[in-house]
Amino acid sequence: QNDDFEKCLPVTGEITALELMQNANFKLEGTNKYGNNVVCRLNNLPKPSTPIGVKGHEDYIEECKEMPAAFAYWAVLEKRWQVIPNPFDLNGKWAWAQVGVAELAMKPGDGLAFVFVTNGDVKFPD
């Protein structure tokens, strides 16, 4: 889960984060309970038959039944484009998405990031 992938896609109007990722050929897998609103796997990571290997939970295998484990999950981050940057505005900075990927509306210029979080360690993109 340490591989970085970056893609820039041209869009002309509003699109959901789920549609954006599908158009970029990323494979998203949701959970049995929450469907595609929750990202359980991204490009088959974490692997469905291999322990995640997170310290303190070395033998845990993610089954994608309900919410992913609090110690190992994909964080969905968004960054809103703005014409004139305002340092006091959260727009233009990476922030936690407030809705699931199937509902998260993205517009031209917005950014979307998925960061695999282990034991609460979130590494926000630059």
Task: Give the role of each language-model region.
Residues Q1-D126:
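Ubiquitin-like/PB1-type beta-grasp interaction modules and other compact soluble beta-rich domains
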